[in-house]
Amino acid sequence: MKLCVTVLSLLVLVAAFCSPALSAPMGSDPPTACCFSYTLRKIPRNFVADYFETSSLCSQPAVVFQTRRGRQVCANPSEPWVQEYMDDLELN
């Protein structure tokens, strides 16, 4: 009886650790960052160090600006100031 309880407990632990790894289909990478809202204010340009665009798997497109202090700020890619910052960062 003790052996059955031990084996069953071990199987439950193995299943608990393996199921998240197996839940996504092979070859599908979940998006690393998605934005669900945009900043309402224009960020000062001198605060921005870098940017990246969110994955097409996200529910809405966004540009994520990385500030010099390491914060990430989501912005609407259709805003003119966002496009301007992206162009400027590409040139530098």
UniProtKB/Swiss-Prot annotation:
Ribonucleoprotein keyword on record: no
* Top-level lineage group: Eukaryota
Keywords of this entry? Chemotaxis, Cytokine, Disulfide bond, Inflammatory response, Secreted, Signal
Q: Which GO terms describe its cellular component?
A: extracellular space
The terms under GO molecular function for this entry are:
CCR chemokine receptor binding; chemokine activity
Q: State a single Pfam family of this protein.
A: IL8
Q: Which GO terms describe its biological process?
A: antimicrobial humoral immune response mediated by antimicrobial peptide; chemokine-mediated signaling pathway; eosinophil chemotaxis; inflammatory response; positive regulation of cell migration
Q: Which SMART domains match?
A: SCY (SM00199)
Q: Fetch the InterPro entries from UniProt.
A: Chemokine_b/g/d, Chemokine_CC_CS, Chemokine_IL8-like_dom, Interleukin_8-like_sf
Assembly description = Homodimer. Interacts with CCR5.
Instruction: Identify its protein family.
Output: Belongs to the intercrine beta (chemokine CC) family.
Q: What is this protein called?
A: C-C motif chemokine 4
Supply the source organism for this entry.
Answer: Canis lupus familiaris (Dog)
Provide the organism lineage as a comma list: Eukaryota, Metazoa, Chordata, Craniata, Vertebrata
The primary gene name is: CCL4
